[in-house]
Amino acid sequence: QAHPQFIPCGTIHAAYAAEHDFRAELAWMRAHGLHGVKIHPEFQHFNLDDERLFPVFEEMERTDMFLISHTGDPRVEVSGPERMVRVATAFPNLRCIATHLGSWGDWEAERIRPLAKLPNIYVDISSSFSYVEDKAPLLEMMGLYDPRHIFFGSDYPIWCPHKVLDKTQALGIEPGLLE
C-alpha cells in the first residue's frame, strides 16, 4: 500500500445487497485492501438502519470490517443518531463511525447521548465546526464521547482539510486531547 496512513473503504447500496451476492462484494473489498464500508443514506436514498443491510452488517462484523456512515441532518431523518444506535446495538462487535459528531445539523448533546454511550461507536468531526458560530454545543457533544473514539475529518472535497484543521486548533482544546 503506497499510503499506509490512509484506510480505504468501499461502499454498498441497500438495494444491491438485497439482490446480489454482497458477501462476494465484501470479500473483493477485503482482498483489495479495503477495511470498511462507507454509506451516505441521504445520497443513496435509504435509511441507515434499513434491514436489507443487516446481513451486510452481520458479515462485516464477522470479518472485522467497519462501517462509516453520514449521520444526522434532521431535514430528512434517514440517518439520525437513533438509527445508528439501532445498528450499533444490533451488531455490538461492528465498529461504527458516525460522521459529524453523530448528528450533523442537530447540535444538541441530548440527541447523541444514547449513541455516545455505546462502546463500538466512533465519531469524526467533519463539517461540524464549519456551520455554526457558537462552538459550545459542539464541545459539549465531544465531551460525551471517549476522546479515543473521536477522529479528525475534513469532509473533503466540501471543506479544505487545512481550513478545518485551523478551526479545530482554534477551539482551545487541550493539546493532549487533540492528539
Question: Predicted segment positions?
Answer:
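A short, conserved beta-strand element in the Rossmann-like catalytic core
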Residues: N47, P157-I158
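Mid-to-C-terminal alpha-helical segments outside catalytic/metal-binding sites
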Residues: L144-F151, I158-E179
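Short, flexible active-site loop motifs that bind/organize anionic cofactors or intermediates
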Residues: F43, S128, T168
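Short secondary-structure boundary segments
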Residues: P41, S127, S154-Y156
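Short, aromatic/basic amphipathic alpha-helical patches
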Residues: M29, R111-P114, D166-G172
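Catalytic pocket-lining loop regions of alpha/beta-barrel enzymes
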Residues: H35-G36, F46-F151
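Mid-domain alpha/beta scaffold segments of enzyme catalytic cores
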Residues: Q1-P55, E59, T63, I121-D124
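Cofactor-binding loop segments of dinucleotide-utilizing enzymes, especially the Rossmann-like FAD-
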Residues: T11-H13, L101, D155
